[in-house]
Amino acid sequence: MSSIFDKVKAIVVEQLGVDEEEVTMETSFEDLNADSLDIVELVMALEEEFDIEIPDEDAEKIKTIGSAVEYIKENQ
Protein backbone atom coordinates (compact mmCIF):
# COMPACT_ATOMS: atom_id res chain seq x y z
CA MET A 1 0.00 0.00 0.00
CA SER A 2 2.76 2.45 0.79
CA SER A 3 4.07 2.35 -2.78
CA ILE A 4 0.61 3.32 -4.08
CA PHE A 5 0.48 6.07 -1.44
CA ASP A 6 3.96 7.27 -2.43
CA LYS A 7 2.96 7.47 -6.10
CA VAL A 8 -0.33 9.22 -5.30
CA LYS A 9 1.52 11.65 -3.02
CA ALA A 10 4.08 12.43 -5.72
CA ILE A 11 1.31 13.13 -8.24
CA VAL A 12 -0.59 15.35 -5.78
CA VAL A 13 2.57 17.29 -4.86
CA GLU A 14 3.42 17.81 -8.54
CA GLN A 15 -0.11 18.67 -9.71
CA LEU A 16 -1.09 20.95 -6.82
CA GLY A 17 2.31 22.39 -5.94
CA VAL A 18 1.96 21.53 -2.25
CA ASP A 19 4.60 20.38 0.23
CA GLU A 20 5.01 16.63 0.76
CA GLU A 21 4.45 17.16 4.50
CA GLU A 22 0.91 18.38 3.76
CA VAL A 23 -0.06 15.10 2.08
CA THR A 24 -1.21 12.28 4.39
CA MET A 25 -3.79 9.52 4.03
CA GLU A 26 -6.26 11.75 5.91
CA THR A 27 -5.67 14.89 3.83
CA SER A 28 -8.66 15.92 1.74
CA PHE A 29 -8.26 17.53 -1.64
CA GLU A 30 -10.27 20.43 -0.22
CA ASP A 31 -7.59 20.85 2.49
CA LEU A 32 -5.08 21.27 -0.34
CA ASN A 33 -7.24 23.97 -1.97
CA ALA A 34 -7.87 21.82 -5.05
CA ASP A 35 -10.62 23.16 -7.28
CA SER A 36 -12.72 21.12 -9.70
CA LEU A 37 -10.20 21.52 -12.53
CA ASP A 38 -7.40 20.35 -10.21
CA ILE A 39 -9.46 17.28 -9.33
CA VAL A 40 -10.06 16.44 -13.01
CA GLU A 41 -6.33 16.77 -13.72
CA LEU A 42 -5.47 14.63 -10.68
CA VAL A 43 -7.91 11.91 -11.75
CA MET A 44 -6.39 11.90 -15.25
CA ALA A 45 -2.87 11.67 -13.82
CA LEU A 46 -3.90 8.80 -11.50
CA GLU A 47 -5.58 6.97 -14.38
CA GLU A 48 -2.42 7.28 -16.45
CA GLU A 49 -0.03 6.32 -13.63
CA PHE A 50 -1.99 3.26 -12.52
CA ASP A 51 -3.48 2.30 -15.91
CA ILE A 52 -7.05 2.33 -14.62
CA GLU A 53 -10.23 4.14 -15.59
CA ILE A 54 -12.02 6.15 -12.92
CA PRO A 55 -15.63 6.88 -13.94
CA ASP A 56 -16.96 10.33 -13.03
CA GLU A 57 -19.37 8.91 -10.44
CA ASP A 58 -16.45 7.21 -8.67
CA ALA A 59 -14.18 10.25 -8.97
CA GLU A 60 -16.81 12.32 -7.14
CA LYS A 61 -16.54 9.95 -4.15
CA ILE A 62 -12.75 10.28 -3.88
CA LYS A 63 -12.37 13.10 -1.35
CA THR A 64 -9.10 12.27 0.43
CA ILE A 65 -5.67 10.94 -0.42
CA GLY A 66 -6.57 7.77 1.49
CA SER A 67 -9.75 7.22 -0.50
CA ALA A 68 -7.76 7.61 -3.73
CA VAL A 69 -5.23 5.02 -2.52
CA GLU A 70 -8.01 2.60 -1.52
CA TYR A 71 -9.81 3.06 -4.83
CA ILE A 72 -6.63 2.35 -6.80
CA LYS A 73 -5.85 -0.69 -4.64
CA GLU A 74 -9.32 -2.13 -5.28
CA ASN A 75 -9.36 -1.41 -9.01
CA GLN A 76 -5.85 -2.19 -10.20
Curated annotation (Swiss-Prot):
GO terms for cellular component: cytosol; membrane. Residues 2-76 form the Carrier domain. Pathway: Lipid metabolism; fatty acid biosynthesis. InterPro entries: ACP, ACP-like_sf, PKS_PP-bd, PP-bd_ACP, Ppantetheine_attach_site. It is found in: Cytoplasm. PROSITE patterns: CARRIER, PHOSPHOPANTETHEINE. Keywords: Cytoplasm, Fatty acid biosynthesis, Fatty acid metabolism, Lipid biosynthesis, Lipid metabolism, Phosphopantetheine, Phosphoprotein. Gene3D superfamilies: ACP-like. One of its GO terms (biological process) is lipid A biosynthetic process. One of its GO terms (molecular function) is phosphopantetheine binding. The modification O-(pantetheine 4'-phosphoryl)serine is found at residue 36. 4'-phosphopantetheine is transferred from CoA to a specific serine of apo-ACP by AcpS. This modification is essential for activity because fatty acids are bound in thioester linkage to the sulfhydryl of the prosthetic group. Belongs to the acyl carrier protein (ACP) family. Carrier of the growing fatty acid chain in fatty acid biosynthesis. This is Acyl carrier protein. It comes from Heliobacterium modesticaldum (strain ATCC 51547 / Ice1). The lineage of its organism: Bacteria, Bacillati, Bacillota, Clostridia, Eubacteriales. The gene is acpP.
